[in-house]
Swiss-Prot record:
This is Chaperone protein HtpG. Homodimer. It is found in: Cytoplasm. Residues 569-641 are annotated as: C. It comes from Aeromonas hydrophila subsp. hydrophila (strain ATCC 7966 / DSM 30187 / BCRC 13018 / CCUG 14551 / JCM 1027 / KCTC 2358 / NCIMB 9240 / NCTC 8049). The keyword Zinc-finger does not apply. The gene is htpG.
């Protein structure tokens, strides 16, 4: 390898500088993971070359035996991880090794606490890949040449993990990438042949590319004992495969240990943490495929970025085709990682071909169903573990009913909510739990959406339900309103918002209660008309209500109107929102409303009516358009009291 004069120095992206500093100074309890990450990258490079060579065999350059090699140089204290995969061009080296091209980076650094143990877990969760080399090395040299380019188009990248790196043109005879680690003084264990072999066996048995190390030969020797005087012929040195190099998903699930599944997940997902659960499934018949699907233990930083790449590793007849094949997993299951190996897709498949392919549609349905079945079993068998899943991925799963109509009922069974029957804001109540506790005569499932748990729990709309002992589901996440606009029924029972339309408790109310309501409406007809005239265009309608027991007033939307939370959701998304007028409901039994009816001075009456309307707006919407006028009005009325 010879170096040319075309050398440049580049500064690292700010986030990379921070990451490298963490790599150098974090006390990793498990330093050996750097080798897993680098071998995993080398394996991916081999997979990508194998796929590209399907349409251009010349990329193999008469060397189709793909492999990864570990080379130890004890004298110079270097460990080299070498592959003959796809390789990189100069521009690719600068892009991939000088920047972190993933969303969530800023949030990742914001979450770092300075606690080395906790930060090490976060680093693993973020997935640092190549940069893990700096855990054990104080200098890293990368020499690469892209397949299909001339030997003199090689490139060398080098950095000591500080603020910059150098890039130079070099001549490299073979394609692929060599990552040369100049080990720190205290990392001699990674120069030991047997130590490296044990790490490879532990982490890389499952990858399909052979990992090789050089086995020294033995010289000729003279025998002793019965063979005294005879010459024993030595053995030549040779490259020896040290991993099984068998794709894990092709093996019999009964023969695979949990530890092997866990290590394969870390390879596929580039995660340092064990998965929460997994499912290995082989199907034969009209379609033939194998899926190995994992649910991570922790949500990635970019989970809520729906445009971020997600999906499965796609193989066709054990040949790697692509990463992040999102066509096989709906967006609401974008947290799922794993492998799909199909015998029914063509080897020359592209993302465009996958888009409208019948096989793709069928596989997507099967994979979605498989994940939902795994989650249902987890919820049934291990409530504590499912609660952990829900805390990480629950809000994403709530997108499901809008996206996957066919599985809406199965998704609904997996949802969890807080409720007025529980203590605190823990979301532990399923819809099946709710239905099982419904009061005699109750025909509907009641819920409320609000800005926060406190706003939902203390809403005046819940007063009549508390009085009658009827459970109400409490929702305050931004996605909840979107969810409930698509989940309108469960187990044959309608889901009803307590803040929309006229209150109808059905058989929960007796005839005497209904009669009393009608009488209250008649008795307060004059007051209602005065309030309407006073508020004018500020409200859609005014009426008396029996939904309140402690509050004097509340506002509601009509049965088909847009809810407060949906309006906020659309505004946050920059969507145009039509003007919304609310219905003001008055509690005829409240002292303030009775006092209101006795006020003859129209100006004073108007002040009190406006105050009751603003109070109701504040309780429902969490804010007012003109809070200063509200405060002034309260002060004026207090002075008159």
């Amino acid at each position: 390898m010879t170096q040319s004069v075309h050398a440049e120095t580049h500064g690292f992206q700010t986030e990379v500088k921070q990451l490298l500093s963490l790599m150098a100074h974090s006390l990793y309890s498990n330093k050996e993971v750097f080798l897993r990450e680098l071998i995993s990258n080398a394996s991916d490079a081999a997979d990508k070359l194998r796929f590209k060579a399907l349409s251009d065999a010349s990329l193999f350059e008469n060397d189709g035996q793909l492999r990864v090699r570990l080379v130890v140089d004890k004298e110079n204290r270097t460990l080299t991880i070498s592959d003959n995969g796809i390789g990189m061009t100069r521009d690719q080296v600068i892009e991939h090794l000088g920047t972190i091209a993933k969303s969530g980076t800023a949030e990742f650094f914001k979450n770092l606490s300075g606690d080395q143990g906790r930060d090490s877990q976060l680093i693993g969760q973020f997935g640092v890949g190549f940069y893990s080399a700096f855990i054990v090395a104080d200098k890293v040299t990368v020499v690469s040449r892209a397949a299909g380019t001339a030997p003199e188009q090689g490139v060398q990248w080098e950095s000591e993990g500080e603020g910059s790196f150098t890039v130079a043109d070099v001549t490299k005879a073979g394609r692929g990438t060599d990552v040369i680690l100049h080990l720190r003084a205290e990392e001699d264990e990674f120069l030991d042949d047997w130590r490296l072999r044990s790490v490879v066996s532990k982490y890389s048995d499952h990858i399909s590319v052979p990992v090789e190390m050089y086995k020294e030969g033995t010289p000729d020797s003279v025998g002793e004992g019965e063979e005294d005087g005879e010459t024993i012929v030595g053995t030549p040195g040779e490259w020896e495969q040290v991993n099984r190099a068998t794709a894990l998903w092709t093996r019999n699930p009964k023969e695979i240990k949990d530890e092997e599944y866990q290590e394969f997940y870390k390879h596929v997902a580039h995660d340092f943490e064990d998965p929460l659960l997994w499912g290995h499934n082989r199907v034969e018949g009209a379609q033939e495929y194998t899926s190995l699907l994992y649910v991570p233990a922790r949500a990635p930083f970019d989970l809520y970025n729906r445009d971020q790449k997600h999906g499965l590793k796609l193989y066709v007849q054990r040949v790697f085709i692509m990463d992040d094949a999102e066509q096989f997993m709906p967006a609401y299951l974008r947290f799922v990682k794993g492998v799909l190996d199909s015998n029914d897709l063509p080897l020359n498949v592209s993302r465009e071909i996958l888009q409208d392919n019948k096989v793709t549609v069928s596989l997507r349905k099967a994979c979605s169903k498989r994940v939902l079945t795994m989650l249902a079993k987890l919820a049934k068998d291990d409530a504590e573990k499912y609660a952990k899943f829900w805390s990480e991925f629950g809000n994403v799963l709530k997108e499901g009913p809008a996206e996957d109509y066919a599985n809406r009922e199965e998704i609904a069974k997996l949802l969890r909510f807080a409720s007025t029957a529980g203590e605190g804001e823990a979301q532990t109540v399923s819809l099946e739990d709710y239905v099982g506790r419904m009061k005699e005569g109750q025909q509907k499932i009641y819920y409320i959406t609000a800005d926060s748990y406190a706003a939902a729990k203390n809403s005046p709309h819940l007063e009549i339900f508390r009085k009658k002992g009827v459970e109400v589901l409490l929702m305050w996440e931004r996605v909840d309103e979107w969810l409930m606009s698509h989940l309108t029924e469960f187990d044959g029972k309608q889901l009803v918002s307590v803040t929309r339309g006229e209150l109808d408790l059905g058989d929960l109310e007796d005839e005497a209660s209904k009669q009393a309501q009608e009488e209250a409406e008649k008795a307060n007809a004059g007051l209602v008309e005065r309030v309407k005239q006073s508020l004018g265009e500020a409200v859609k309608e005014v009426r008396v209500t029996h939904r309140l027991t402690d509050s004097p007033s509340c506002i509601v939307t009509d049965a088909h109107g847009m809810s407060t939370q949906m309006i906020k959701l659309m505004r946050a998304a920059g969507q145009p929102v039509p003007e919304q007028k609310y219905i003001l409901e008055l509690n005829p039994d409240h002292a303030l409303v009775k006092k209101l009816g006795a006020i003859e001075d129209e100006a004073l009456f108007g002040e009190w009516v406006t105050l009751l309307h603003e109070q109701a707006q504040l309780a429902e919407q969490g804010g007012l358009n003109d809070p200063a006028s509200f405060v002034s009005r309260i002060n004026r009325l207090l002075l008159q009291a």
